[in-house]
Amino acid sequence: MGRDTIADIITSIRNADMDKKGRVRIGYTNIAENIIKILLREGFIENVRKHRESNKYFLVSTLRHRRNRKRPYKTILKRISRPGLRIYSNYQRIPRILGGIGIVILSTSRGIMTDREARLEGIGGEILCYIW
């Protein structure tokens, strides 16, 4: 049985958010790096750095906090396409999350991107997750 790295990323961030931790450590893969870059660009996390520990690489992400800096924002992440049930969409049928407030992360032929980027380029792909 294979590992679902996208579900691992989502679960790590969700657990750190629920436990009110400021940082989360995720095992490094190319998919993890691309998803974390999207979260950083969209403002769901503050900072990311690549960390090496005994020949293994990790991505250490700092979650975005509220203005009073006491606790992280509540970020909801939902895995859509999974290894047992793949969900694909063309660019015209990519769902809008909360009327465009949330984002959809897709895996396309041109890499991992958000729903807005996929609509602009006119390409569809596999819907990986929703974030709002």
UniProtKB/Swiss-Prot annotation:
One cellular-component annotation, GO: ribonucleoprotein complex
UniProt keyword list: Chloroplast, Plastid, Ribonucleoprotein, Ribosomal protein, RNA-binding, rRNA-binding
Pfam families the UniProt entry points to: Ribosomal_S8 (PF00410)
Main subcellular location of this protein, as a coarse class: plastid
A single MF term (Gene Ontology): rRNA binding
GO biological process annotation, one example: translation
UniProt KW Membrane keyword: no
Subcellular location: Plastid, Chloroplast
InterPro entries per the UniProt record, alphabetical: Ribosomal_uS8, Ribosomal_uS8_CS, Ribosomal_uS8_sf
Keyword Transmembrane appears in the UniProt entry: no
Subunit structure: Part of the 30S ribosomal subunit.
Cross-referenced NCBIfam families: PRK00136.1
Function of the protein: One of the primary rRNA binding proteins, it binds directly to 16S rRNA central domain where it helps coordinate assembly of the platform of the 30S subunit.
Similarity comment text for this entry: Belongs to the universal ribosomal protein uS8 family.
PANTHER family: 40S RIBOSOMAL PROTEIN S15A
Protein name in the entry: Small ribosomal subunit protein uS8c
Lineage: Eukaryota, Viridiplantae, Streptophyta, Embryophyta, Tracheophyta
